[in-house]
């Protein structure tokens, strides 16, 4: 059997992936404790520490995600949007070919993402972007942290209180009516953020299962490629360079 090795994931893509994994795991772990804080009897000071930790991990997560969005325009051939988003020239044919191969039990190898994988990656990236955006809003409404914290603090500060002195869980520093109005506007963002928490858990679980199943059935070094940047195939992949 002649094995051929192909370069696929550049260093920036690999760093993004594993930093994203670490951030998401940290956010899920801390976020779960925050959700259960009342049941666990966590005092307000403890909640502030938990939320602050969550936000700082979130900053790293968002910056990493923003860099990946930029890298989709300037990165390697398999990291670019034209190789990730589920449309473009030839995508429909590739998608139909993969479905046919699945029905027939055949393996169709790809150096980059498979047509079905491109849909999954796009959905996952969309969920991550929405979670990051809502998280930044909540960093401002809950802790008065950047990027929106100063504006929110100025809007809810009590008369005679400098906005820089507004603190979470300190009702004496805020105007009750302005604070209530802010919390009412915040409610849909909280619902979205919490719902996406469960959506992301489901998507991540499906992602891991799909990768494991593909590795077991067809090989392709999917996991190791995210360390080495290379995939190895016995047969020519469908998206090999000409």
Model regions and ranges:
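Membrane-embedded alpha-helical bundles that constitute the cytochrome b-like, heme-associated redox core
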Residues: 1-242
